[in-house]
C-alpha cells in the first residue's frame, strides 16, 4: 500500500502585468505629468461591454491625434460614441486647462457594466420571451505629456 501525504493546497496567483510597461515603451514615465489629467465619462450607452472593450483596447496608451484617426477608420459601431467622448475630453482639456491637443495621451480607457433593460417579445400561443438590452459606462482619462528637451 502506498501512503499519501496531505499537503495544504495554495493556489498560485498570477501577477497582473501593469499597463505602465506598455506606456514605458511609448512614452517615458518621467515625461508623463502625474496630476495633469482630464477625466471624461459617458453613462448608460446602449451597447454591450464586450463590443466597446475591443475598441478601447486599440486606443489605450496612444496619443490623441492617433486615436482620432484610428476611431474614424474603425468599422465598429462602438467607435462612434467613443470618438465623441474622446473629442469632448480633448475639448475640455483645451478649454478649461489650456492643454495642447498634440501633447494629450490616453492613459486610461475602461468600460463597466450598467443596468440591463428588460423587455418582452410576444411569442406564439400567448407566451412571451425576454429581450435584454445591455448598457455600459465608458471612462476616458487623458494625460498631458511634457515636451522632450
Swiss-Prot record:
Belongs to the universal ribosomal protein uL22 family. InterPro entries: Ribosomal_uL22, Ribosomal_uL22_bac/chlpt-type, Ribosomal_uL22_bac/org-type, Ribosomal_uL22_CS, Ribosomal_uL22_sf. Its main location: plastid. The keyword Cell cycle does not apply. This is Large ribosomal subunit protein uL22c. PROSITE patterns: RIBOSOMAL_L22. Part of the 50S ribosomal subunit. GO terms for molecular function: rRNA binding; structural constituent of ribosome. HAMAP family: Ribosomal_uL22_B (MF_01331_B). One of its GO terms (cellular component) is chloroplast. It holds the Pfam family Ribosomal_L22. PANTHER family: CHLOROPLAST 50S RIBOSOMAL PROTEIN L22-RELATED, LARGE RIBOSOMAL SUBUNIT PROTEIN UL22M. The keyword ATP-binding does not apply. One of its GO terms (biological process) is translation. Keywords: Chloroplast, Plastid, Ribonucleoprotein, Ribosomal protein, RNA-binding, rRNA-binding. This protein binds specifically to 23S rRNA. It is found in: Plastid, Chloroplast. The gene is rpl22. Coiled coil: none annotated.
Amino acid at each position: 500500500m502506498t501512503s499519501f501525504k496531505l499537503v495544504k493546497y495554495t493556489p498560485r496567483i498570477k501577477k497582473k502585468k501593469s499597463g505602465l510597461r506598455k506606456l514605458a515603451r511609448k512614452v517615458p514615465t518621467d515625461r508623463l505629468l502625474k496630476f495633469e489629467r482630464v477625466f471624461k465619462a459617458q453613462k448608460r450607452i446602449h451597447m454591450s461591454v464586450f463590443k466597446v472593450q475591443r475598441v478601447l483596447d486599440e486606443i489605450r496608451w496612444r496619443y490623441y491625434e492617433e486615436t482620432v484617426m484610428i476611431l474614424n477608420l474603425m468599422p465598429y459601431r462602438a467607435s462612434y460614441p467613443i470618438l465623441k467622448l474622446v473629442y469632448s475630453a480633448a475639448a475640455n482639456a483645451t478649454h478649461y486647462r489650456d492643454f495642447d491637443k498634440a501633447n494629450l495621451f490616453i492613459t486610461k480607457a475602461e468600460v463597466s457594466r450598467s443596468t440591463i433593460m428588460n423587455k418582452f417579445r410576444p411569442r406564439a400561443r400567448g407566451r412571451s420571451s425576454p429581450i435584454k438590452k445591455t448598457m455600459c459606462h465608458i471612462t476616458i482619462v487623458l494625460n498631458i505629456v511634457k515636451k522632450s528637451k
